[in-house]
Amino acid sequence: MSGDPTVLVIGGGATGTGVARDLALRGVDVTLVDRGGLAGGTSGRSHGLLHSGARYAEDDPRGAEECLRENRTLREIAGTCLRETDGLFVRLAGDDPDYFEEKLGACEEVGIETERFDADEAQAVVPGLSDDVAEAFRVPDGVIYPSRLVAANAADAERHGATVHTDAPVEAVETADGAVSAVRVGGDVDAALRPDHVVNATGAWADRIADLAGVEVGMAPSRGVMISVEYDGLAPVLNRCRDPDDGDIVVPHEGEAVLGTTSVPVDDPDEYETADWEVERSIEECAAMLPAVAEAPEVRRWWGVRPLYAPDETGPNRRGISRGFTVIDHADEGVGNLHTVVGGKLTTYREMAEVTADRVCERLGVDAACDTATEPLPGADDPDRLDEFVDRYGGTNPTDAGVVSAAADDD
């Protein structure tokens, strides 16, 4: 390739493509590279929940507020990258009623709209809900199709002048005089790029890029399993209303239900063991809320790795680590043109990208406002067009394979 970009974004998940889109809309010359297809890491291997913030309301109100803001924004700009479903937090007979009240009160304090149901009302909302249900409350959860969301961000970035390269792994980072001087990119690029600024948006792999640049990022990744089973007719997301534990969420995916998940620390987000107990426990626990999933035919299973940022780890299974995000300025470590963005959730990718782009533009002296909260994604209301974008950038991923690939097969 010819020419060096002003900004090089490393990482083609939701956050990386969000940063590329944001910068491109501000008129910045940006190139994005990813070692594989887009959304192939954490973004496309999640359970696909559009968070209302309720899962974190009592323990992490900052993270909950971020989720709620972006939940509302994405409903305005992302169209059929999402599915509006609502969610229920379900207390079963053996679950702590005080925790239910604490969760409900925390949601209301954060500003999350809720509606309380007794057992009969909850079973009317969700046919097949366990007879052990004691009470529930509704929140504005939803479903994200990450392959579409990420591809639409990349397509809009390119429409505004960005360059996007898949199958382009970073092989080396050179520094000189207090800055990244060159980034060696392999694969289809096969060149040394010399950007003015670099954004490390590689999620659970952020410490690897940081290591290449001679700086530190304290990642504490954890793996979790998802099992998709055949299940028609589930309308809302189901969340078990108890202290966070394995198997506490069921996400509807158009004829399927995604059951999850576990939280097991891993040292290497590429090479880690998986265990049958994770699958068995997730199914058993989810079936406590929705019994029919215990015998439902399995469609697929996959593991994903959470990109948790924790210089000081919290808890043996890392469930206590904040789901808020952090933008790290590596100027403090002697590399003045490198930012890393870590943590956060798929739901908050756009805000993460905006804050990162603000920092980069400030460093570059670019005076341009962010438009991504109000500018709809291309093809937002046209699923066929969105799926064309998905094909362009590497195809579907496990989270939404049953939706995106099915739509493509119907063409």
Language model region names:
Residues 24-46:
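Glycine-rich FAD pyrophosphate-binding loop
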Residues 5-32:
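N-terminal Rossmann-like FAD-binding beta1-loop-alpha1 element of flavoenzymes
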Residues 47-126, 133, 245, 383-406:
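Dinucleotide-binding Rossmann-like beta1-alpha1 core, especially the glycine-rich loop
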